[in-house]
């Protein structure tokens, strides 16, 4: 999983300040509403932050419109969204905290080896939140749940960069 497993960074919430059951439910239900849009999610991130696209050797330097409809793009987008879905499914249950932490530790370590910066994790977060807020029912409660989840996720993953 490349940089977009970073999406996983955008989702959890198990470590520093665990998500409550209600917060986890908000994150999970909003994610479920868009998780079938793998290609669109990844394309939105690349469109907002071309420096993130440049971290993917198979997509670097290519026009987004020319790669968006390719099998390679769809495969990679699905890989990223599947990882995020796993992390999100585990969130909100204290007995899963170690599993979530392990996934995020590995995410940070893997991305350190690829030269991904904390700033790029922040960019990914911004693009993901923008995508979500435009494609799901987005109120203050949903925004707060996602922000808490992403704060927790970033704290763990970025610590390993």
Swiss-Prot record:
InterPro entries: Erythrocruorin (IPR002336), Globin (IPR000971), Globin-like_sf (IPR009050), Globin/Proto (IPR012292), Mb-like_M (IPR044399). Heme b binds at residues 76, 111. PROSITE patterns: GLOBIN (PS01033). Keywords: Heme, Iron, Metal-binding, Oxygen transport, Signal, Transport. The keyword Heme applies. Residues 1-16 form the signal peptide. It comes from the Eukaryota. Belongs to the globin family. Homodimer. There are at least 12 different components in Midge globin. This is Globin CTT-VIIB-4. It comes from Chironomus thummi thummi (Midge).
């Amino acid at each position: 999983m490349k940089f977009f497993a970073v999406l996983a960074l955008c989702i959890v919430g198990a470590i520093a300040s665990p998500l409550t059951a209600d917060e986890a439910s908000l994150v999970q239900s909003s994610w479920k509403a868009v998780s079938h849009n793998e290609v669109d999610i990844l394309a939105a991130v690349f469109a907002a932050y071309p420096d993130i696209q440049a971290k993917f050797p198979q997509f670097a330097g290519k026009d987004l419109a020319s790669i968006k409809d390719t099998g390679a793009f769809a495969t990679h987008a699905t890989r990223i969204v599947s990882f995020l879905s796993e992390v999100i499914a585990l969130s909100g249950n204290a007995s899963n905290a170690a599993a979530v932490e392990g996934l995020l530790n590995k995410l940070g370590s893997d991305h350190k080896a690829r030269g991904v910066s904390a700033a790029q994790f922040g960019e990914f977060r911004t693009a993901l939140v923008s995508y979500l807020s435009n494609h799901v029912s987005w109120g203050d409660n949903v925004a707060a749940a996602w922000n808490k989840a992403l704060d927790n996720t970033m704290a763990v993953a970025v610590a390993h960069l």
